[in-house]
Amino acid sequence: MHLVPEGSESMSTQQNGSAQKPVTLNGSASTKGQAPEAPLETPGLIQLAICVLGIYASFLSWGVLQEAITTVNFPVRPPTAEEPNPPTERFTFSIVLNTIQSTFAAITGFLYLYFSTPAGKKVPSIFPTRKILFPLLLVSISSSLASPFGYASLAHIDYLTFILAKSCKLLPVMFLHLTIFRKTYPLYKYGVVLLVTLGVATFTLHHPGTSKKVAASAAKNQSGSSLYGIFLLSINLLLDGLTNTTQDHVFSSPQIYTRFTGPQMMVAQNILSTILTTTYLLVMPHLSSTGALHALLPIPIPPSTETELASAVSFLSRHPEVMKNVLGFAACGAIGQLFIFYTLSRFSSLLLVTVTVTRKMLTMLLSVFWFGHTLSAGQWLGIGLVFGGIGAEAVVQKREKQSKEQAKALTGKKE
């Protein structure tokens, strides 16, 4: 999911439980002729606990279902005496999965936007200006292309490598900000990137133990297959970075695109993504009946005489238990997004980053115990470097924020 870029918390009207006071042109608060405003309710520990538990429950379940959908093999037909071990197949229909996910997210995002709008006020437009269509379309295309590359990489690397690399989005985001948007970073952020890169390299070089269920088949072509999987995952991360940097640009440019909030981005991006992927599923088979066009597209889907949609429906009819996982996956992702946006509007972004980073760590640990993965000391060192770097960034950001608040308080006293 690519819906909460850094900095979008500035678009909310309330943060850390406080609201901005109305200010006149001379900079003083306007109170003449008005009744004193009632203090807004400060979000308490109960709300914080609900948000944290909601994010953990939604995305831990989402992660388990994602691994179950994309890595578990199912027999093509029931075993018999003549064929006790029939061939197996795996759910590889990433665009179908992406379409279901974006549909659920668009619906839940719209419901959130509708019911969170105060009574008597108009629901904010999903596409407020024409200028915003291009960056939103770019976000939808990059996010729609990113998922197939990510899911395709799971055929060559295990889920733990996938999750650890997905925790390193700082790398492509920083690269694209430096090259496209000419944005500079403080020195400590480059140190964080170095730690994260060393952690990923350490974890990858000490190739993680595969699941007990697929260890025999994975050992046959481990080295070359893993390199190809890392290549696919690198493309996925680059597209994720393009998605996030474009979102940052939209949120930080209200003078160009008008004020645009997180829920609006959630709905708009998922609607456009659903339209794009549905069009692909319905139109592309008629344009590529021989599979030649598939080979030219930058999407790692092997050519097939069947359409992906028809193949996915056929797979789900043979394995109806997977359909439950797919629907649960989409629902957990959509609900998780709602908790993220609520947390972003009621608390600080630093808290949200802390919650999501620890959630990713718990996802990895849950994967270890749930699916029988094993980790060596080298892999644990890699994990420690990655999350140590991200944790150090959170500490520095907290100190910077405290320094800014103290400086602001001193300035206010002088005035």
Swiss-Prot record:
Glycosylation sites per record: 16, 26, 221, 244
Q: Does the keyword Membrane apply?
A: yes
UniProt superkingdom: Eukaryota
Chain segments annotated as transmembrane? 45-65, 95-115, 132-152, 161-181, 185-205, 223-243, 281-301, 325-345, 368-388
Name the membrane topology term: Multi-pass membrane protein
Composition-biased stretches, type Polar residues, lie in 9-33
As for subcellular location, the record says: Endoplasmic reticulum membrane
Query: A Gene Ontology molecular-function term?
Result: UDP-glucose transmembrane transporter activity
Keyword list (alphabetical) reads: Endoplasmic reticulum, Glycoprotein, Membrane, Sugar transport, Transmembrane, Transmembrane helix, Transport
Function recorded in the entry: May be involved in specific transport of UDP-Gal from the cytosol to the Golgi lumen. Involved in the maintenance of optimal conditions for the folding of secretory pathway proteins in the endoplasmic reticulum.
Query: So what family is this one in?
Result: Belongs to the nucleotide-sugar transporter family. SLC35B subfamily.
Entry protein name: UDP-galactose transporter homolog 1
Q: Which organism does this record belong to?
A: Aspergillus fumigatus (strain ATCC MYA-4609 / CBS 101355 / FGSC A1100 / Af293)
